[in-house]
Amino acid sequence: MELRKITTPRLTTACRFHGRPDGRKLLLIHGNASSSVFYEHIMERLEDKFCMAAPDLRCFGDSDALPVDATRGMRDFSDDIHELVEALGWDKFIIFGWSMGGGVAMQYAIDHSDKLDGMVLQSPLSPFGFGGTYGEDGKKLEPLGLGSGAGCANVQLIAALQSGDRAFIASVIDSIYVAPPFQIAP
């Protein structure tokens, strides 16, 4: 597993690379509240079949913490991905997107379908962002853009985030996001 930083005109992206250099190219896009680290286990299992890259999206992991224009849906992330694959010289590849990464992958497919050999989505959100949308033009389910995400939030976790209760936050991350024996320091 190799971690490199790739600088494009848009930003510097931290990216994990693994697999066969001559294998089919597979780009793995992580979800919200995660990073490319989440794909290390999968990359190890697929190392004999694919040439893989797993970038940290902007504001995540070790990539530049640049602002995101929410009015563009997933397009800031998708544009970053396009610059990255151009810098890597990838002409054709399979894109895999999980959660928010699925929305990024769909936006990439809308804008650059000619670059894709395939797309795999795992529990994706809309390419139009976090508000509830429908249809190919991203029409809002209701005028304020409500209808996804926060309605399912854990009230205790929100209170811990507001009060700075790092021990509770670490326990949530340990139980949901990471595998033993790894633990988040309180």
What residue ranges belong to the model's regions?
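Alpha/beta-hydrolase
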Residues: 140, 148-186
